[in-house]
């Protein structure tokens, strides 16, 4: 595994990330959610992609792709491991979203290329990274109240917003993926909340990927 080459690719790709608002359709008609997991001890990469109507946030389509994992887990290089399955699920969608939430980091990455940014560049779609853990940077401790907010900073640069979306829950790290500004990324996540820790697009992607009760109930209603 030539990590020096992958690192150079990350730096080059990161320079192409658009950190400004460049939505083709604003407000979007459809917002997507993406989540990646691994099965069979990491041998299989599973990506779930969902499509929600906006502003109702109603689930209208989902696709799950499973492919052989092509790369081991190496911190800081996760997007190279995850994007092939994401691309396979994306290509199955009959309708592509105008904005995509990705479970993972955007520019809040040591080389400014988390999976939300990498995938956004690959398919040239506006993306937002919604991560559950910090990868780099520092932030001031948040109060315990829902709505508590702090910028994630690294070397004098804001990489994300750290936002407590729900009481007694760990905060989310919300960042530009591609073609969405940092402030707009936060605003879009806030518009897509329905009382859970996660915004609806990534909550549904996780539900589909893991076969959670909410998704099972949705399937039963569709029958």
From Swiss-Prot:
Q: Give the source's domain of life in one word.
A: Bacteria
Query: What InterPro entries does the database record attribute to this sequence?
Result: Endonuclease-V
Name of encoding gene: nfi
Protein's cellular compartments: Cytoplasm
Q: Which family does it belong to?
A: Belongs to the endonuclease V family.
Q: Which organism is it from?
A: Salmonella paratyphi B (strain ATCC BAA-1250 / SPB7)
**Protein name (record):** Endonuclease V
The entry lists its GO molecular-function terms as: deoxyribonuclease V activity; magnesium ion binding; RNA endonuclease activity, producing 5'-phosphomonoesters; single-stranded RNA binding
Q: Which GO terms describe its biological process?
A: DNA repair
Which keywords describe this protein according to UniProt?
Answer: Cytoplasm, DNA damage, DNA repair, Endonuclease, Hydrolase, Magnesium, Metal-binding, Nuclease
Q: What is its cofactor?
A: Mg(2+)
Function field? DNA repair enzyme involved in the repair of deaminated bases. Selectively cleaves double-stranded DNA at the second phosphodiester bond 3' to a deoxyinosine leaving behind the intact lesion on the nicked DNA.
- Its Enzyme Commission number? 3.1.21.7
What is one cellular component GO term in this UniProt entry? cytoplasm
Site feature Interaction with target DNA, where: 73
Q: Name one Pfam family in it.
A: Endonuclease_5
Q: Where does Mg(2+) bind?
A: 35, 103
Q: Which reaction does it catalyse?
A: Endonucleolytic cleavage at apurinic or apyrimidinic sites to products with a 5'-phosphate
Q: What class of enzyme is it?
A: hydrolase
Q: Does the keyword rRNA-binding apply?
A: no
Presence of keyword Secreted: no
């Amino acid at each position: 595994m030539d990590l020096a080459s992958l690192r150079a690719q990350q730096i080059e790709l990161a320079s192409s990330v658009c950190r400004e608002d460049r939505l083709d359709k604003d407000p979007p008609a459809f917002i997507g959610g993406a989540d990646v997991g691994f099965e069979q001890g990491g041998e299989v990469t599973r990506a779930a992609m969902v499509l929600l109507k906006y502003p109702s946030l109603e689930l209208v389509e989902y696709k799950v792709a499973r492919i052989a994992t092509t790369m081991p887990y190496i911190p800081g290089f996760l997007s190279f491991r995850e994007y092939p399955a994401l691309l396979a699920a994306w290509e199955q969608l009959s309708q592509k979203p105008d904005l995509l939430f990705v479970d993972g980091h955007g520019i809040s990455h040591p080389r400014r290329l988390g999976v939300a940014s990498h995938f956004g560049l690959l398919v040239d779609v506006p993306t937002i990274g919604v991560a559950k853990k910090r990868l780099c940077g520092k932030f001031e401790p948040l109060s315990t109240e829902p709505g508590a907010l702090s910028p994630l900073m690294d070397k004098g640069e804001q990489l994300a917003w750290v936002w407590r979306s729900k009481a007694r829950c760990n905060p989310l790290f919300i960042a530009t993926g591609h073609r969405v500004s940092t402030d707009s990324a936060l605003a879009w996540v806030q518009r897509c909340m329905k009382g859970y820790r996660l915004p609806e697009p990534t909550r549904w992607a996780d539900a589909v990927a893991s076969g959670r009760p909410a998704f099972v109930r949705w399937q039963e209603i569709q029958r």
